[in-house]
């Protein structure tokens, strides 16, 4: 009886001591992972104005448009840091000023 109680107690302690980690991939099926300061719908008036000024064609874009984006690079031992929205984008224009075809993702929950 003592051995059975000991095993049950040990397993319970092990379960409590093990941290639960839920991780999602920080990779995209297509495109690249970026951190964007702002996200807009591709058919919004703001994006229409920006696209016109930059001569970008956003008609038929699947996904949102990210503004002021930078590539999300994993930090050694610390994961990735993003104070904006983490997204997966199909196209990067003007060094990340505008990213096209973006969809939100979760990184390192």
UniProtKB/Swiss-Prot annotation:
Transmembrane segments: none annotated. The keyword Signal applies. One of its GO terms (molecular function) is structural constituent of cell wall. CDD domains: hydrophobin_I. Disulfide bonds join 28-88, 35-82, 36-69, 89-102. Keywords: Cell wall, Disulfide bond, Secreted, Signal. Residues 1-17 form the signal peptide. PROSITE patterns: HYDROPHOBIN. GO terms for cellular component: extracellular region; fungal-type cell wall. It is found in: Secreted; Secreted, Cell wall. Aerial growth, conidiation, and dispersal of filamentous fungi in the environment rely upon a capability of their secreting small amphipathic proteins called hydrophobins (HPBs) with low sequence identity. Class I can self-assemble into an outermost layer of rodlet bundles on aerial cell surfaces, conferring cellular hydrophobicity that supports fungal growth, development and dispersal; whereas Class II form highly ordered films at water-air interfaces through intermolecular interactions but contribute nothing to the rodlet structure. Belongs to the fungal hydrophobin family. Self-assembles to form functional amyloid fibrils called rodlets. Self-assembly into fibrillar rodlets occurs spontaneously at hydrophobic:hydrophilic interfaces and the rodlets further associate laterally to form amphipathic monolayers. This is Class I hydrophobin 7.
């Amino acid at each position: 009886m003592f051995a059975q109680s000991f095993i049950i107690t040990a397993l319970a302690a092990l379960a409590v001591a093990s941290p639960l980690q839920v991780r999602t991939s920080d990779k995209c099926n297509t495109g690249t992972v970026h951190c964007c300061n702002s996200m807009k719908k591709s058919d919004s008036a703001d994006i229409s104005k920006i696209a016109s000024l930059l001569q970008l064609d956003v008609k038929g874009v699947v996904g949102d448009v990210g503004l002021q984006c930078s590539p999300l690079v994993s930090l050694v031992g610390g994961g990735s840091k993003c104070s904006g929205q983490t997204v997966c984008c199909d196209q990067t224009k003007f060094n990340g000023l505008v990213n096209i075809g973006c969809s939100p993702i979760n990184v390192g929950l």
